[in-house]
């Protein structure tokens, strides 16, 4: 009998009941809430006269709608200009107070983006099932946890029952072997993977990322990789547990301690795929061949190395692909065969649940140190992923490096990743962004998003156009 994959093990650990229609009932260990997808769920509980099944399994924080300027944050919820945004943040506070759920409110130093806060607090632990009303919940799979996004109706189901109806996925292994070149990061790995398999490549699969290059990554780098599993079509991304995982979790507020810690570690050490486990699909990449990546189009799969040129639709024989390239070039305002390094930028955004952790800010600051944001850049934002990340960065003096270079140093939140708060692009503007999606209008109506790593974003800010960051780090 073949061994089990990590995904198989996690599924079996949480299986409550297999149903005749092929679906199953699985138990949920951790539920993370934010202000956008939770209001209707809480209202559903009230209408049904229910209470959360396990209050202690839930934590919450506002992130999507919160303003990131210090002036707006000092004014509290009342200072949020947009009426809908203000109402959503206020409603989360009220719902968490009413139902007794732990919430890190807008001006709590522990507040931040849900997928930064969960791991930071130790609320995400190896072997858990973790859900949140946000598609980038796959981030938490970096801890060997089965984590994925859910819809608003499912948020209510989890609150009420601590269970979820789901169908088991297929297994995909993405194996990245070798050593990454200097200046090439976890973000470049995952963009290269998406460029290789496409945004539908992982459909119906849970992706396990493995290989020496993945093992060499820090936990924060692994979170970046798992975060963008959904852009590769997979709801779930996973990395096996190792000593780095255990060291990261130890001593965090929600982590077990004393005897329970030893018991937990003994369990966690088995959260790896068996040597003889079988995967439905295997994809292999050579880390040494990966270069700094830049997305050029309106889908994360439209990505190239920084030294390449955007495609020419005339050279594409497939009429569907040709049409897709033509539409993307038109929206992005680019020419066929235009060099990536010839793309003029208007704004730079360093932040989001993909790249706003302390390691990301250190990488960007290393590039920004002693340099100035180019005069052609209208705005360069640095938005830490949480108040604790911001606090740590300020202790290290990273804020001063950014401010002296001409960047704006902001308060934590989702910020310019999506146009749900005051940080957004104007129509026609090009932005080098460390976020995860470059769809039409994602950062603002008519805005043009280019996905890059934090180091590449900082390099673009000081150069005014894309440049291979390795030229600045040499």
Curated annotation (Swiss-Prot):
**Pathway in which this enzyme or protein is active:** Amino-acid biosynthesis; L-leucine biosynthesis; L-leucine from 3-methyl-2-oxobutanoate: step 2/4
A GO biological process held by the record = L-leucine biosynthetic process
- Which GO MF terms are attached to this record? 3-isopropylmalate dehydratase activity; 4 iron, 4 sulfur cluster binding; metal ion binding
Cofactor: how and how many bound? Binds 1 [4Fe-4S] cluster per subunit.
Q: Which UniProt keywords apply?
A: 4Fe-4S, Amino-acid biosynthesis, Branched-chain amino acid biosynthesis, Iron, Iron-sulfur, Leucine biosynthesis, Lyase, Metal-binding
**Residues at which [4Fe-4S] cluster binds:** 353, 414, 417
InterPro entries hit by this protein: 3-IsopropMal_deHydase_lsu, Acnase/IPM_dHydase_lsu_aba_1/3, Acoase/IPM_deHydtase_lsu_aba, Aconitase_4Fe-4S_BS, Aconitase_4Fe-4S_dom, IPM_dehydratase_rel_enz, IPMI_cat
Segment forming the signal sequence: none
Source organism superkingdom: Bacteria
- What Pfam families does the annotation carry? Aconitase (PF00330)
Q: What is its EC number?
A: 4.2.1.33
> Partners and quaternary state?
Heterodimer of LeuC and LeuD.
Q: What does this protein do?
A: Catalyzes the isomerization between 2-isopropylmalate and 3-isopropylmalate, via the formation of 2-isopropylmaleate.
Q: What is this protein called?
A: 3-isopropylmalate dehydratase large subunit
Native species of this protein?
Answer: Pseudomonas aeruginosa (strain ATCC 15692 / DSM 22644 / CIP 104116 / JCM 14847 / LMG 12228 / 1C / PRS 101 / PAO1)
